[in-house]
Amino acid sequence: MPENAQVIMRYGPYSSIGLPVEHRTYRLEGLLAVLAEDGHQVLLEKIEDWNVVELMVNGEVVFRCNIKDLEFGGDGKLDPLCREARIAVLNAY
């Protein structure tokens, strides 16, 4: 994947510690940081599927996971899912 590619991050609502279900970006911070570090432009798009995060490159989903499996906050460098997502984006064409 060329540097400065556009990545669409689609994310759904989730419930956190008894709070109502809604779209939150706290668990996306590490993933956003990892992709920004590689120079990618990331557009956030809300979807209605609960607990889902998808990364799309060139109209194709290259990575998908449960949003609750991502680490809360942080820079994403120690999160294995962020590493997996980064590799998926870099390998996308």
From Swiss-Prot:
Annotated InterPro entries: UPF0728
Domain of life per record: Eukaryota
Pfam families named among the record's database cross-references: UPF0728
Family in the record: Belongs to the UPF0728 family.
Protein's recorded name: UPF0728 protein C10orf53 homolog
Organism annotation: Bos taurus (Bovine)
